From Swiss-Prot:
The keyword Metal-binding does not apply. It holds the Pfam family Baculo_p74. One of its GO terms (biological process) is viral life cycle. Keywords: Viral occlusion body, Virulence. This is Protein p74. Essential for virulence of baculovirus occlusion bodies for insect larvae. One of its GO terms (cellular component) is viral occlusion body. It comes from Choristoneura fumiferana nuclear polyhedrosis virus (CfMNPV). Belongs to the baculoviridae p74 family.
Length: 645
């Protein structure tokens, strides 16, 4: 019997992802109704999305889910105040370290899941990041590191001993209006900052007036600046420097009612939602029920915009559903004699273990270990969910159909893990959590940025700090480092954040896995021909109504241990080499032990005849040496094993 190919398993995972995304809309509405979302529904295309089996032509969808403009603003979280990072007890407020006030500790920082935020150890684990909404209708992650550097001078250093770096007013910070760089923040000089260094704000930079330049030429810039700073009481201000109000020239900090802000954030609702229509999303709706089929038989795309409503546009697919041609009825290379579910699962896992056996041979031991651990965790959760799905479904499920569904579920689980751990978005969230953990963490990340501040100016000479181009150069440097620290090999693409990146707030992994199994089963059952053109004939297998969950988990874990013949040969080679080396190192142990045993017997006889203590001492020494050489070989073997393993 033919089985699903890698292409089929990938298509099944894509189908399940789109259908799960459709159901996810309703779950998001229930859990986070105040975070508004947009979505687009259209019939799936075999060319652009995934292969659509003929049996699914009336319900296969491509679903796109994104934050609306207001939803993106509601999800934004800036986690730094003047002197540190926010915690789960920090209330919403503003900083006023420059002429522009900056809000921090927005409700999204710790109120997406308040119960999780209040658990021990989660005090500094922010639940969101800082975003901006672009003209292209994307919720984009911004470079909060540069914003923090511009706005919170205290966080620039750890020891706070470098004069003129952290004991200064902040730069005015604002988002870059350039649509090509929505992630970027721009810094600007202000009068308070220039005054701190004995200069005046002129043409966007900090400069001397023309007559001050003449005086500085005669006295020297350093001497003139010192007298000017004394006259402006700068030194007295530095003795009692307040990082929250670094200059008397700055406006007062805005007063914020954090409780009112939180209540307003929670009270937001999308009045344009059609609840009766969206209720269908969890009931496997057809294209006709969703209104994606026009009266003339054409296909439609349905786009929902929060607080506005629906908009339909016609779309055209050429040959949207083309049945696969049957090329090979026999499929001799893909047969299983034993149709037991355990055999199907074990065969699948062992087949993939060969691939990772090769990876081990060329040096990917860490990859193999991580894959083993991941596979065990997946199987431990997946097989119980598979049984729940089998009991809950109303369709006839055969052994082979369930086995192929299991394979697709493994691939789908790995795709989900990859999204959460390997994507640029996941890396970005991880960095936000690290930066929000401590001030030390912030400084460490600053020191790892490429071409950081010290590459641009000398903090003690102040030679390049005051031209109006300096903040722009600094901003560009941070933006470059922002991309390079996320992924040195990635393209400079905008990092869009989607609601599904926050699925942990809405649903558990077990629930997501269980719901996805039904979609995977539907897709696998609808396939009649695999991507190689082989007939599948899943219905010809025996029906299955239940299975021993514990036994199958054990069978899967044993199969996924990836203990291949290659590993066995490597293990036996190491053991044989160790035994041979140990034997060579202890080649004369037997002869030496025999000599000491002979000496022991002679010393014992002499002691019994002459009753002298000297002979007894010889007897004891010879006996201990003989025993040592008798146990020396096994002792060294097990000692080496303990060190190696």
């Amino acid at each position: 019997m033919a089985v699903l190919t890698a292409v089929d398993l990938t298509n099944a995972s894509r189908y399940a992802a789109h259908m799960h995304r459709l159901e996810f809309i309703g779950r998001w509405r229930e859990r986070l109704p105040h975070i508004l979302i947009d979505y687009t529904l259209r019939p799936a295309s075999s060319e652009d999305d995934y292969y659509v089996p003929p049996k699914l032509r009336d319900r296969a969808l491509a679903v796109k889910l994104a934050f609306s403009r207001r939803g993106c603003d509601s999800m934004s979280c800036y986690p730094f105040h003047e002197t540190g990072v926010v915690s789960n007890q920090t209330e919403f407020a503003y900083t006023q370290t420059s002429e522009t006030s900056v809000a921090y500790s927005q409700p999204a920082c710790y109120h997406l899941d308040r119960a999780a935020a209040m658990r021990e150890g989660a005090e500094n684990e922010v639940q969101s990041a800082e975003f901006t909404y672009t003209p292209n209708n994307q919720c984009v992650l911004v470079d909060s590191t540069s914003k923090m550097y511009f706005n919170s001078p205290y966080l620039r250093t750890e020891e706070h001993t470098i004069m003129g770096v952290d004991d200064v007013p902040a730069f005015n910070v604002r988002p870059d209006p350039d649509p090509l760089f929505p992630e970027r923040f721009k810094g600007e000089f202000n009068e308070a900052y220039c005054r701190r260094f004995g200069r005046d704000l002129m043409n966007g930079g900090c400069s001397f007036r023309w007559w001050e330049s003449l005086i500085g030429f005669v006295l020297g810039d350093t001497i003139y600046v010192t007298f000017k700073m004394m006259a402006n009481n700068i030194f007295s201000e530095l003795r009692d420097f307040d990082y929250t109000a670094p200059s008397p020239l700055l406006p007062a900090r805005p007063v914020a009612d954090s409780n009112a802000v939180l209540a307003q954030w929670r009270a937001v609702r999308d009045r344009a939602v059609d609840w009766n229509f969206e209720k269908q999303f969890s009931e496997a709706p057809t294209l006709q029920q969703l209104g994606l089929l026009a009266d003339n038989g054409g296909l439609m795309q349905l786009a929902y915009t929060a607080e506005t409503g629906f908009a339909k546009t016609p779309i055209a697919y050429s040959a949207r559903v083309t049945p696969r041609a049957v090329r090979d009825f026999g499929a001799p290379g893909r047969q299983l004699n034993d149709e037991e579910l355990e055999a199907i699962i074990a065969s699948f896992l062992e087949e993939y273990s060969l691939v990772f056996g090769i990876a081990t041979d060329i040096g990917f031991d860490m990859l193999l270990t991580a894959f083993k651990t991941m596979l065990k965790k997946i199987n431990t959760a997946l097989i119980p969910a598979l049984k729940r799905m089998l009991v809950s479904t109303s369709q006839r499920v055969t052994v082979r159909l369930l086995g192929e569904t299991y394979k697709a579920a493994i691939v789908h689980s790995m795709n989900r893990i990859a999204i959460k751990t390997l994507t640029t978005a996941a890396k970005a969230l991880t960095r936000i959590a690290i930066k929000a953990s401590s001030v030390v963490g912030i400084v460490l990340i600053l020191f790892t940025l490429a071409d950081l501040v010290l590459a641009l100016w000398d903090p003690f000479g102040y030679s390049n700090m005051f031209p109006r181009e300096f903040p722009d150069d600094l901003s560009r440097t941070f933006l470059t480092a922002y991309f390079e620290t996320l992924d040195a090999n990635s393209s400079r693409e905008i990092i869009e954040f989607l609601p599904e990146f926050f699925s942990d707030v809405v649903e558990t992994d077990d629930d997501a896995t269980f719901q996805s199994l039904f979609h995977l089963l539907d897709y696998v059952a609808a396939l009649e021909v695999n991507s190689d053109g082989q007939m599948l004939h899943f219905t010809e297998s025996n029906a299955i109504e239940d299975f021993d969950e514990a036994t199958l988990v054990g069978q899967a874990l044993a199969s996924s241990s990836l203990y291949t013949r290659l590993e066995f040969m490597q293990y036996t080679f190491r053991q044989n080499t160790l035994l041979e080396m140990n034997k060579n190192n202890n080649r004369f142990n037997g002869a030496i032990a025999s000599l000491f045993l002979t000496g022991t017997a002679v010393a014992l006889a002499a002691f019994m005849l002459h009753k002298k203590l000297t002979f007894f001492v010889y007897f004891a020494i010879f006996l201990m040496l003989a025993l040592y050489y008798l146990v020396k070989e096994p002792y060294e073997y097990f000692k080496t094993i303990d060190l190696l393993f």
